[in-house]
Amino acid sequence: MEVIIGRDTAELAHVGADAFESLLNRKPDAVLGLATGSSPLSIYDELAARCQAGRVSFAKARGFTLDEYVGLPADHPENYRNVINTVFASRVDFAPGAVAGPDGLATDIPAACAAYEEAIRAAGGIDLQILGIGTDGHIGFNEPGSSLASRTRIKTLTRQTRVDNARFFGDDVDAVPAHCLTQGLGTIMAARHVVLVATGRSKAEAVHQLVEGAVSAMWPASILQHHPHATVLLDDAAAHRLQLADYYRETYRSKPDWQGI
C-alpha cells in the first residue's frame, strides 16, 4: 500500500488524475470503477479539465459505478447513475452507454447483482477503481461487519451512513434509502489498481484503521492492506492519526519518477 499525504486537495487531485491519465494513455479501452460521494470530486474536476485540454480521452473506456440505492427512482437526482453522469461522465468524452451501474430498481435483486458481476467480468475486470471511505471505514456500501470476500449484493445501511449522506437529501435522514446494492469487498479487491482518497479530520480514525490497524470486517477498508496495488491519497487532516505519517511523506518525496503511481 502506498500512502501519499498531499499538501492540499489540489495536489491530491493531480496525483489521482495522473493515475487515470497514465492508464488511459497505455490502455485507451481501460475499465474504470467510479465512486460517488464528495471524496473523488476534485479528481473528477481535474480529469474533466485534462479531457477538455486533449490530454486524456475516455472515448474507448468503460465505467462501472460502485453502488446504487435500492428503490430510488431513475430520475431522482441522487440516483447514482445520475450523480456520476452529472459530476463526471457528461463532462468527458465517454461513449453513450459506456458507464453502467447496479440496477437498484430490479424486481429480482440477487439476479441483478449476479448480472452486474458478470458484466464486470465480461468487460475484462476493472483496471482502476477509485474509492472514498466512510467515517466508519466502509468502502462502497460495505458497512462494518461485511464479509471480506463479498461480491455485489444488497446491504442495509447503518444509521451513521444515512446520517452522513443526509446532506444529499436536504438533511433529512429519513429520506436516505435504507438499502443499497454495492460491489462487494471481494469485487473491489479484484480491481488491478485501487485509488482511495480521504480528506478532513472526520476521516482520520477510519484512515488510521485502514492503513495501520488490523485487517478486520469491523473496518472494511482495512482489507486493502492485502491489495497488491493500492494507493491512498490523504490530506494532513485525514492523516493526522497515522503513526508513520512522517515516513509516508519522506517515502513519497524521495520516490523515483520511473516508479509512477
Regions found by a protein language model. Give the residues of each.
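Short beta-strand segments
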Residues: 33-37, 65, 102-103, 130-133, ...
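Ligand-binding beta-strand-loop-alpha-helix segment within the catalytic cores
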Residues: 56-129, 246, 251-260
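A short secondary-structure junction signal
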Residues: 111-113, 140-146, 150-152, 206-210, ...
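Class I SAM-dependent methyltransferase SAM-binding "motif I" and its flanking Rossmann-like core
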Residues: 136, 140-185
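N-terminal glycine-/serine-/threonine-rich phosphate-binding loop
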Residues: 1-32
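ATP/nucleoside-binding phosphotransfer catalytic cores, i.e., glycine-rich phosphate-binding loops
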Residues: 186, 190-261
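A glycine- and small-aliphatic-rich helix-loop capping segment at beta-alpha/alpha-beta transitions
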Residues: 46-57, 80-82, 144-154
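Glycine-rich N-terminal segment of FAD-binding domains in flavoprotein oxidoreductases
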Residues: 26-52
